[in-house]
Amino acid sequence: FILSIQKNEFNINIDRNDQPDLENIEHNYLNSGGQFWLAINNHQNIVGTIGLIRLDNNMSALKKMFVDEGYRNLKIGKKLLDKVIMTCKEQNIDGIYLGTIDKFISAQYFYSNNGFREIKRGDLPSSFPKLDVDNRFYYRNLKD
C-alpha cells in the first residue's frame, strides 16, 4: 500500500530496502512503545496508514502517514492524526516530529493546518529515524 503510493503516484525513488521499519512493524513500532494504525474501508481494504515511534526525552516521530488517493478529502487523514495526538497526550509525549518530501504539497498544507510548524533537519532529535528522501521536516508541540 505505502510503497505503491510512493512509487506509482509520486514517482519517488524508494523501495522496500529503504524502509526497513515496514518489514517488522511489531519490532519497529509496537515493541518500542509506538503504534501503527490502519484505516480500513467496508471491503476490508487498507485506505490509510499512520505510525508513531517513541523517541528520547518524551518526544515522538510520526511515520508512514498515507491515504489512498480515492479516499482523500474524506477526513481519514485527520482521524488518523487525531488518534496519534490523543495517544501521545495519554502517554505524556511532549511533541511530534515528522519528515516528508517536497512533492507531498498537500501533506505539507495538512500538517501546517494541524498545528505543525516547519523546522530544519538540524533541529531534529538525534533519535529521529531519517529517510534519505525526506527534505521537509515538521514539529508539533503538545505541551500547550
What are these regions (language model features)?
Residues 14-18, 59, 76, 96, ...:
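A short linear-motif detector with a strong N-terminal bias
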Residues 71, 75:
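Glycine-rich phosphate-binding loop
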Residues 1-63, 68-69, 81-83, 87, ...:
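Acetyl-CoA-dependent GNAT
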Residues 94-97, 101-105, 109-144:
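C-terminal "cap" of GNAT-fold acetyltransferases
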Residues 79-96, 110:
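Conserved acyl-CoA
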Residues 13, 91, 99:
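Residue-level signal for short amphipathic helical patches enriched in basic/charged
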Residues 67, 91, 102:
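Conserved residues at beta->alpha junctions
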